[in-house]
Amino acid sequence: MTESGGSDMGMAGAGAAATAFDGSVLEANPAGMARLPGTTITVAAVPALVQLDFKGSATTPGSAHNHEGPKLTGSAFAVQSFSGLSLGLGLYSYTGLGADFGDEWVGRRVIEHEQLRSLNIAPAVAYQVTDHLQFGGTLRAQYVEVEASLAVNNSAALYGPPAGLPDGQVSLQGHSWSPGGDLGIAYQPRPDVELGLAWTSAVHHTVDFDVTAAGLHPVLGAILPQALPVSLSLTLPQQVAASGAWQATPATTLAATARWQEWSTLGEARQMSGLGDRPMFPQGLRDTWGASLGVRHRLPDGTRLSAGVAYDSDPSREGTMPAYFPSSSQLRLALGGEWPAREDLTVRLALSVIQQGEVRVAQLGHPLPLPGVGPLSGTFPASRFYFAALAVDFRR
C-alpha cells in the first residue's frame, strides 16, 4: 500500500523517497525527516473499497462478487527536528485489505472470507550530515492479523451417512508481531533538485491460528483435531525505491519514483498443520517493479494541487493465482489537493484509483488439505480499488 495519506498519495507515490512535504516521509524515506523544521504532526484517515468479481469456467461455472464494504485505515506521524537531528514516530499500515465472497459461490470451499491487516509502530531517526545530505532509519514493530473462513464438504460420499448435510464451516484467526526496519538517504545536488533512495526490509511472520468449526459431519468432526495446530509462515517483501523531484518553476514540482519489491519471498509462504506442510503459492511468485510520475502545483492563494500515475507489474509466475490471492498488474491514477487552513495547519484530500488487470485462477487444491475441496478455475476480470484520504498536517 502506498496510500498512507501523505502528500505523495496525490502523486501516486511519485517522488516519495526524495521529497519531504509532511510527516509521512518517515515511512517513505526516514532521511527526509531531517528537512522538516520544528515539529510536524500528520494524521490521516484512509477509507478503502475493493470492487472484485469472479467468473467461473466451463468446468467450475458460477460467479461471485466481493460483498465487503468500505474499510477505514489510517496513519499518524510525528517528527521533531533539533539542530541536525530529527526524531520521529510513525503508526501506519504496510499491506492489507480483504474480500468476502459469501457462502454460495463455486469457490466457497477454497475461501469465503479473508482479511489481512497490518500495523507498523516505527520510531525513527534522521541526521543532517551536510547542507545537502541526510541519512535516516527506522526500527519497526510490525503487527499482522490474518482471518479466513471457508466451507467444508460434508458429503456422505466422503464420510458415509448421514447424507444430505449442508456444508460445514471452518474459520481461522491469528496474529503475529515481528521486527523490521528501513534505511534511507536523501541528497540535494542543487536547490531545485531532490534525490532519495530508501530500503524497506522484509519481515517474517509465523501466524498461529485459532481454528473454530461448526456444522461438520460427525466423522469430519472427529478427524479435524488431527489437523491441529495450524500456522502460516510468510515473509512480507522487502522494497527498494529511488525517487527524484525537480522544482521546474517556483510553483511547480515534477517527480518520479522507480521501485522493486521482492514478492518471490512471499511466494514461499507455507501453511503448516497436523495434516502436512503445504505451499500457499504452488507456482511461487515473482519480484515486481513499478514506476510513478507526478506533478504538484501551488496556486497563488497557497492551495496545492497534485496528480500522478503509477504502474506495478504482475507478481504471478505462471500467469495464474490462487483464489485467495487475486493479484495482478496495477495501474494507479491519483489526484490530491491541500489547503492552508491557517499558518500552522494544512488540510489535505486525496483520491487514488487502482485498475487491476485480469487474474486467472487454476487451483487444484488447498493449503488446508480437507477432503472434497475440488478444483477451481475461472477469472477475476479487471477490478478496481478505491482509496480516499482526509489528512491534516500540523507544523510548529
Give, region by region, the residue ranges found by the protein language model.
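Intrinsic-disorder/low-complexity, polar/charged segments
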Residues: N29, F54-G56, T249
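Outer-membrane beta-barrel porins/channels
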Residues: M1-S4, D8-M9, T59-G62, K71-S75, ...
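Outer-membrane beta-barrel pore proteins
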Residues: G15-F21, L26-T39, A78-G84, G96
